[in-house]
Amino acid sequence: MDEKTKIYDITIIGGGPVGLFAAFYAGMRNASVKIIESLPQLGGQLSTLYPEKYIYDIPGYPAVRAQELVNNLIQQMKPFDPTIALEEAVQSVEKQVDGTFEIITKKDTHYSKAVIITAGNGAFEPRRLDLPEAEQYEGKNIHYFINDLSRFSGRRVAVCGGGDSAVDWALMLEKVASSVAIVHRRNAFRAHEHSVNNLEKSSIAIKTPFIPTEVLGNGDKLTHITLQEVKGDTRETLEIDDFIINYGFVSSLGPIKNWGLELERNSIVVNSKMETSIPGIYCAGDICTYDGKVKLIATGFGEAPTAINNAMNFIDPKTRVQPMHSTSLFE
């Protein structure tokens, strides 16, 4: 059987942190594994949107850079040599007459005995700055993603937004930029209290409650932004080198909504086995929902083994759902 017709035990749709850990765990269960990822690299949103940001709620890490966490997860699964298909967006998943699944992407067709969906928040794109002239500076010095913190060294930076991402980026940029301002339309920030406390103690200029109303530049780069006080008359112009927009992201399930799965809003409904409404298809991570669900990477790390163990039992009912501990497997 060649690679194109090979039937894998487990195919994981989504190569973010939960998908990577699921691949490792499936390898420990001696499963043949394939990861299908729509982006050009593994890591999901951590690698694409926040590679330089620190994550503070991963067990065993007081703080870990997002890309470092991804690199460690890739290293962890490497001994099991999973097959990886990058830049392949899955269009459909259909159960065949023989009980296996046919997974069709824009590039290829894959086959699997069971499927684990770890697609995070689905397809996503940033909420953009809706101002005249802004679009021409996107990709120049208006940014929605930060891949390299060092590029802002010695520069004057303004960050717009009031959530965790905006506050975290402002605090990280303070260490490298010559000056940082954060602009938010409300007086109160929505970020974690600890981060807001650090922000208030920092040298960052806090511009609240203000919104950007105008961007000014020379056609090649943005040079100034005009701020307007919300429900007030105060106007202020900032001279800046970079403008970072953190208005959040718009996500959608994309083709997943057409796969016949039970959905609740933008999530896939699962039971205590992490099983969807279609037997043989399981979920883990932010893509799934159940009563009491908490959307954290750490939660997804716990859900992945549950999904894998039950998928293995689906493939072969003689297989134990509760496996040996990893300390025994690697001795």
Curated annotation (Swiss-Prot):
Gene3D superfamilies: FAD/NAD(P)-binding domain. Signal peptide: none annotated. It catalyses: 2 reduced [2Fe-2S]-[ferredoxin] + NADP(+) + H(+) = 2 oxidized [2Fe-2S]-[ferredoxin] + NADPH. FAD binds at E37, Q45, Y50, V90, F124, D286, T327. It is an enzyme of class 1 (oxidoreductase). Pfam families: Pyr_redox_2. The keyword Oxidoreductase applies. GO terms for molecular function: ferredoxin-NADP+ reductase activity; flavin adenine dinucleotide binding; NADP binding. Binds 1 FAD per subunit. Its cofactor is FAD. Keywords: FAD, Flavoprotein, NADP, Oxidoreductase. Coiled coil: none annotated. InterPro entries: FAD/NAD-bd_sf, FAD/NAD-binding_dom, Fd--NADP_Rdtase_type_2, Ferredoxin-NADP_redctase_2. Belongs to the ferredoxin--NADP reductase type 2 family. Homodimer. PANTHER family: THIOREDOXIN REDUCTASE 1-RELATED-RELATED. HAMAP family: FENR2. This is Ferredoxin--NADP reductase 2. It comes from Listeria monocytogenes serotype 4b (strain F2365).
